[in-house]
């Protein structure tokens, strides 16, 4: 059930961290619980082993029809394990929902910044779907519920900025970091630094940007 065949004669210190966690899960399953509490169960396990083990245990619990409350300080672990997230701050729940919902539509700046990189752009509402920013007019695919002329801040994830090298582009490429599965790019727009996450490094010192329509996330301006 937990892929530990042939290890029954070993002592605990002879097992890896991942194997010890599988033993703990197996012992808990003997009682046929309806709900399990997992409190930071993977904190001392190597990163690559940790993510593999999280997916294994998630699959196992679903196959057995067992619910789980999983406590973690790692957003990567939470995204990999959870069907629903509850994000706490100082003992209070900030937001509850599906992982993608919290990431794409955070209710406040704390949730937005805790779950990933963010850019904030000054924005003025031009109609029910669009705002004017220093980049361009950016439109959402659903009404944002704000009044025309209202001045706010638009949140954009680095992945939402699509960059293309262009000699006459409005953006200055200030820094690029190749990180394997993506490239982190810092660009300057009207004196403001923005972070983008793209597939391949850019060539040249200037770029253009486009922002695909999405559900706009607008916050009040910082006082």
Segments (PLM) and residue ranges:
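C-terminal boundary and immediately downstream tail of ABC-type ATPase nucleotide-binding domains
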Residues: 3, 104-127, 155, 212
């Amino acid at each position: 059930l937990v892929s530990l065949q042939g290890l029954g004669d070993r002592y605990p210190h002879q097992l890896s961290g991942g194997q010890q966690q599988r033993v703990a899960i197996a012992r808990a399953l003997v009682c046929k619980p309806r709900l399990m509490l997992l409190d930071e169960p993977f904190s001392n396990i190597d990163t690559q082993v940790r993510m593999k083990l999280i997916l294994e245990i998630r699959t196992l619990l679903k196959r057995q029809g067992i619910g789980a409350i999983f406590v973690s300080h790692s957003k990567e672990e939470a995204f990999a394990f959870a069907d629903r997230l509850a994000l706490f701050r100082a003992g209070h729940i900030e937001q509850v929902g599906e992982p993608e919902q919290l990431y794409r539509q955070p209710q406040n700046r704390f949730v937005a910044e805790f779950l990933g990189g963010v850019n904030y752009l000054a924005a003025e509402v031009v109609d029910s779907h669009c705002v004017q920013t220093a980049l361009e007019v950016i439109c959402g695919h659903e009404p944002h519920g704000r009044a025309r002329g209202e001045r706010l801040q638009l949140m954009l994830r680095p992945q939402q900025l699509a960059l293309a090298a262009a000699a006459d582009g409005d953006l200055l490429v200030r820094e690029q970091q190749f990180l394997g599965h993506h490239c982190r790019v810092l660009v300057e727009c009207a004196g403001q630094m923005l972070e983008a996450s793209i597939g391949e490094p850019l060539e040249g010192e200037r770029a253009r940007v486009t922002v695909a329509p999405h559900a706009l996330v607008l916050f009040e301006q910082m006082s």
